[in-house]
Regions:
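Conserved catalytic alpha/beta cores of large enzymes that bind or transform nucleotide phosphates
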Residues: 214-314, 319-320, 361-368, 386, ...
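Extended active-site and interfacial segments that coordinate phosphate-rich ligands
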Residues: 136-170, 194-268, 329-361, 405-412, ...
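N-terminal beta-alpha lobe that positions the nucleotide/phosphoryl donor
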Residues: 1-187, 196, 285-293, 301, ...
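Conserved short loop/turn motifs at secondary-structure junctions
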Residues: 13-15, 46-52, 87-91, 176-177, ...
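Conserved metal-phosphate-binding beta-hairpin within the catalytic cores
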Residues: 138, 310-335
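Acidic, glycine-rich flexible loop/linker segments
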Residues: 322, 336-338, 357-362, 366-389, ...
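Conserved alpha/beta-domain cores
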Residues: 107, 121, 126-136, 140-144, ...
Length: 790
């Protein structure tokens, strides 16, 4: 017997041909994962058989295929005309008795005691949808807050018609699907009241790098369509799976989205408008739309789903404001990252620089350049020529035909999981989304470069810049004669860099985190109450979403450090405590009140001297608290501490005492405290310093300037800066031998070995334990060392 309607709990992934990917997946989760803690709202689906029989018995099938067989889909106006006619025919044709009876019976059961107040979502599920090689982002329609039987029947009709959207017709032709081989199933599902809570999308993989140890969650207030479409810039969270599995706090990143609008149920339904878009209260926009506990609960559900399907997943979720529960409303295989070749790495690097016109969230890691075309609406799509950069407010599936032609895409609105981002990834072109003002700051005809090669933030430059692309194979790296580690400053790039061959991080700098993720002088946060009014306002905006100014500083450090720690776990990550100079601290918000005006900051109030001074001690305590949380609370004990610029043995002792006072005792929980060996005094008295510290990491930049008496910020004598000078090498050799003799760690994290392969080889010959390199030189230097010393 062929069924017309099936309940979700009767369905599983083996039913894709009967009810399409979306409905089969909902059934799969309800049948298999309900007891494991995955909550999916109930519902039923019409079958592909019902759809095909409806078209056949009504005589529509022959009419439709007659039109499609002769259609040239690249003729935009002919496509629009054909699509419109076909959809109208379907909507005007009544359902046969049996199909309508079965839908009515199922609907009455689903409605239960709630009566006509109950609201439903009616979604399309195509039988060829979510084939792992095509993500069909939003190809068919969704109807929300549908109430009452009559409205449900109308919605099901529209869902059936949506199989013949212009974009769906064109997509099938371009992907090589036969129109007759695709059918449509309508899913009718109880609505989750996220209109009075929040909702969003999550991936069980990092969407940009393919890093598999995190769950990436986006969230905003109201119904989830806004996040999916990219109509809103959502909050973002990254959760580290191994830490979550260990029962520890596992959120390694939080980004507060601007969240200006939300979609809610409409009070006036007379025109069939079941939903409406309203502004979000500015105070709400400045808070996160999920609590930490909710973020972790979602990540747990995501992991259960991923384990069950045994592949990376793309999941839509919704929080019910009425019962406070978190529900999964859709799950499908993640289609882009999991297809990529993990064994080759492509690197894009800009060659020049230019003025920055605007910035937003970077999608992918590529660079694109061309002539800007700023489009106000889809009606202007014929303006786009192949190779142009598409600039617009936001995109939806109707834009797909022209997105294929663009060399890059720039939007005002949207987050990492919005429509523009998904399609850009699928097409392999760079996109910068959520810029806010791109359509104002860029004009049609401008020559621009869109760069996603610089981390989480994507930049649009005001001219066409040249760039290099290098491809390296990393599957068969030879044995290296020493540990090759990496220098990582920007947590935004950590997941990406972790794909390179490595033995951990020899230098994780706090400066980038303080400068870019925090941006405020720690003293200005500690003394927030006494700041001038306008400064208070500026700081309040920057710390939105965090419970206090002090907590903001600590939390942001925790996020930056734990992101790098998690990305490279279980390998060591050596975190250097802050090494800003007074002029750099001066430039942070509020910094002018606290920093001296030094003649030569390079040789002034920096490093260990700063930590032990009365003036800075309370700021250093914040850094210590952050390290403590990463190691002791989150359990990332692969994170170690490094102290920079220790001028005297006495100063070294004071820092170790200070760390212990702050709860960071050497040896406790395996904690090592490494010293930057970067002053001639460090090498000359290496033995005495090694009495105090657990090892050395050589800072060749400072060692060179202090040995040769150069200011490395001065351009006049820059040509004399050379870490391969014999005097510098003599000191480095002393330091390496001293550490070897004591059986203590010695590595190098200065620029030298990244710039000069022969210098790296010399260090290995001296017996150094590790060389820590800039990510862009890791593969080349590794191969050089293996070839020449292996």
């Amino acid at each position: 017997v062929q069924e017309y309607v099936l309940w979700y709990q009767e369905l599983g992934m083996h039913d894709v041909n009967r009810v399409g990917g979306k409905n089969a997946s909902l059934g799969e989760m309800i049948s298999n994962l309900a007891n494991a803690g995955v909550k999916v709202p109930g519902g039923f689906a019409t079958t592909a058989y019902a759809f095909n029989e409806f078209l056949e018995q009504s005589g529509l099938e022959a009419k439709i295929h007659e039109v499609l067989d002769s259609l040239d889909v690249d003729d935009v106006s002919a496509l629009a005309e054909a699509g419109k006619n076909i959809r109208q025919w379907i909507i005007d044709t009544p359902f046969q008795g049996k199909l309508e009876d079965e839908i009515r019976t199922a609907f009455v059961t689903l409605q239960g005691d709630a009566g006509d107040e109950a609201s439903f979502a009616v979604r399309s599920s195509a039988t060829a949808e979510d084939m792992p090689d095509a993500s069909f982002a939003g190809q068919q329609e969704t109807f929300l807050n549908v109430k009452g039987y009559d409205a449900v029947i109308v919605a099901v009709k529209h869902v059936f018609a949506s199989l013949f959207n212009d974009r769906a017709i064109s997509y099938r032709v371009h992907q090589g699907y036969d129109h007759k081989g695709v059918a449509l199933s309508a899913g009718v599902q109880r609505m989750v009241r996220s209109d009075i809570a929040s909702s969003g999308v999550m991936f069980t993989i990092d969407t940009e790098s393919g890093f598999e140890d995190v769950v990436f969650i986006t969230s905003s207030f109201g119904l989830g369509e806004m996040v999916v479409q990219g109509a809103v810039n959502p909050d973002e969270f990254y959760v580290h799976k191994p830490t979550l599995d260990n029962g520890k706090p596992a959120i390694v990143r939080r980004n507060l989205g601007s969240k200006l609008t939300k979609m809610i149920y409409s009070a006036d339904q007379s025109h069939g408008n079941q939903v409406t878009i309203v502004d979000i209260d500015p105070a709400d926009s400045k808070t996160f739309s999920l609590t930490d506990a909710e973020v972790e609960s979602l990540a747990k559900q995501a992991q259960i789903i991923e384990k069950h399907y045994d592949r990376p997943m793309d999941i839509e979720w919704a929080k019910d404001g009425a019962d406070g529960q978190l529900y999964i409303v859709q799950a499908r295989p993640e289609t882009v990252r999991s297809r990529e070749d993990a064994q080759t790495i492509e690197r894009f690097q800009l060659k020049g620089s230019a003025g920055i016109v605007c910035e937003g969230r970077a999608i992918g890691h590529k660079i694109g350049a061309g002539q800007a075309k700023v489009l106000g609406s889809i009606d202007e799509m014929d303006k786009i020529q192949a190779g142009d950069v598409l600039v617009t407010d936001m995109t939806d599936p109707d834009w797909e035909p022209i997105m294929k032609k663009a060399s890059a895409i720039v939007t005002n609105r949207g987050g990492r999981t919005c429509h523009a981002a998904i399609i850009a990834r699928e097409l392999g072109i760079p996109a910068v989304v959520g810029c806010g003002n791109a359509t104002d700051t860029i004009s049609t005809g401008d020559s621009i470069t869109v760069s996603c090669a610089e981390g989480d933030t994507g930049y649009i430059y005001n001219q066409e810049l040249e760039f290099d692309v290098t491809t390296s194979r990393i599957d068969s790296m030879p044995e290296s004669p020493t540990k090759v580690m990496m220098n990582v400053g920007n947590p935004d790039r950590a997941f990406d860099f972790a794909r390179l061959p490595h033995k951990g991080v020899g230098l994780a700098r706090l400066e980038f985190i303080i400068n870019r993720m925090i941006g405020v002088h720690p003293k200005a946060l500690l003394n927030f109450d006494t700041q001038p009014e306008e400064l208070k306002e500026e700081i309040s905006d920057m710390i939105a979403g965090y419970e206090s100014p002090k907590e903001f500083y600590i939390q942001k450090l925790v996020e930056g450090i734990s992101t790098i720690g998690a990305a490279f776990s279980p390998e060591k990550v050596i975190v250097r405590m802050s090494d800003f100079k007074s002029n750099e601290y001066f430039n942070l918000v509020g910094g002018y009140q606290y920093e001296p005006d030094e003649e030569n900051p390079m040789l002034g109030f920096r490093g260990a001297s700063r930590y032990v001074s009365e003036d800075f001690r309370d700021c250093f305590a914040l850094e210590c608290e952050a390290i403590k949380r990463v190691r002791n609370v989150m359990g990332l004990t692969n994170v170690e501490i490094m102290i920079p610029f220790v001028r005297t043995v006495e100063e070294g002792r004071k820092v170790i005492e200070l760390l212990a006072e702050q709860g960071l005792k050497q040896g406790e929980n395996g904690l090592r405290v490494i010293m930057m060996c970067e002053l001639p005094s460090n090498a000359l008295l290496a033995d005495q310093f090694l009495d105090i510290f657990d090892g050395f990491s050589i800072g060749s930049n400072d060692m060179t300037q202090l040995t040769l008496g150069l200011d490395r910020d001065s351009g006049l004598i820059a040509h004399l800066f050379e870490e391969r000078n014999d005097a510098v090498k003599a000191l480095l050799s002393m330091a390496i031998q001293a550490a070897k003799k004591r059986g203590k760690y010695v590595g190098i994290c200065g620029q030298g070995p990244s710039d000069h392969e022969d210098f790296a080889a010399w260090l290995v010959e001296q017996g150094i334990d590790s060389v820590s390199l800039n990510p862009d030189t890791v593969v080349e230097t590794w191969l050089y060392l293996a070839e020449n010393l292996g």
